[in-house]
Amino acid sequence: MSEFRSGFVCFVGRPNTGKSTLTNALVGTKVAITSNRPQTTRHTIRGIVHRDEFQIILVDTPGLHRPRTLLGQRLNDLVKTTYSEVDVIGLCIPADEAIGPGDRWIHEQIRAVAPRTTLVVIVTKIDKVPKDRVAAQLMAVSELIGPDAEIVPVSATTGEQLDVLTDVLAGKLPPGPAFYPDGELTDEPEETLMAELIREAALEGVRDELPHSLAVVIDEVSPREDRDDLIDVHAILYVERDSQKGIVIGKGGARLREVGTAARLQIEKLLGTKVYLDLRVKIAKNWQRDPKQLGRLGF
């Protein structure tokens, strides 16, 4: 690559295929929420990969799925808009699961919505299976996509093949100047990142019914009046039902304290200063199906 290249890449795939982990590994810092719960990414977060010869802007999308709620429909619409606006689509398929109807459906969606966009298939999580399983998956992917498919196996966890993937993606971008200054790693507002970090901490280790029902809104961020090394962050966690409120708070508030501690440490890393984090839990009944409430909660 002689001339500088820059452009937009989005990782797509069914929920839980390692897209957010891959984004964070390539950027080198945490810009996308990771959780072993499907459907945990809700905003298209742009992570930025800087090199001397290129700049890749990674757009992280929610996993495509057949929607059951208005929120699900809005997330899918967001994904489809993203498909048609990027330079390269990276379809993520995990090495440790057989290709299924979900992968086929997503491939069809990509080709229907963005038939001309360059497609690279990324076989993720190769550290989780033996080499022969990886080889078998590469063959299966080739059968799904076609013999001309560009396929790159990677592990975001160990870093294996990430440099190869970066070069492949960069090689497919158009020549052009950098979109963002060197050193900038995301264009997400700090408040959005803070809300996502709190949401990630709250989702850790909880039962399946909660992830889709949890939204976090940053209510207020202000420097502490008598101390210049402390920032007060007030946030509200919204759930849909009383029973979910109990799950988030835990017995005697123990669970909410754990969430607060985990999130505070991540937010302190993000802001580079000490943080006092105040969390409150409120009920917003059936917010996923209510257009007014979706708007109020930032969707």
Curated annotation (Swiss-Prot):
Keywords: Cell wall, GTP-binding, Nucleotide-binding, RNA-binding, Secreted. Residues 124-127 are annotated as: G4. This is GTPase Era. GO terms for cellular component: cell envelope; cytosol; extracellular region. It is found in: Cell envelope; Secreted, Cell wall. NCBIfam families: era, PRK00089.1, small_GTP. Residues 154-156 are annotated as: G5. InterPro entries: G_ERA_dom (IPR030388), GTP-bd (IPR006073), GTPase_Era-like (IPR005662), KH_dom-like_a/b (IPR015946), KH_dom_type_2 (IPR004044), KH_sf_prok-type (IPR009019), P-loop_NTPase (IPR027417), Small_GTP-bd (IPR005225). It comes from the Bacteria. One of its GO terms (molecular function) is rRNA binding. Residues 60-63 are annotated as: G3. Residues 39-43 are annotated as: G2. Pfam families: KH_2, MMR_HSR1. Residues 206-285 form the KH type-2 domain. Monomer.
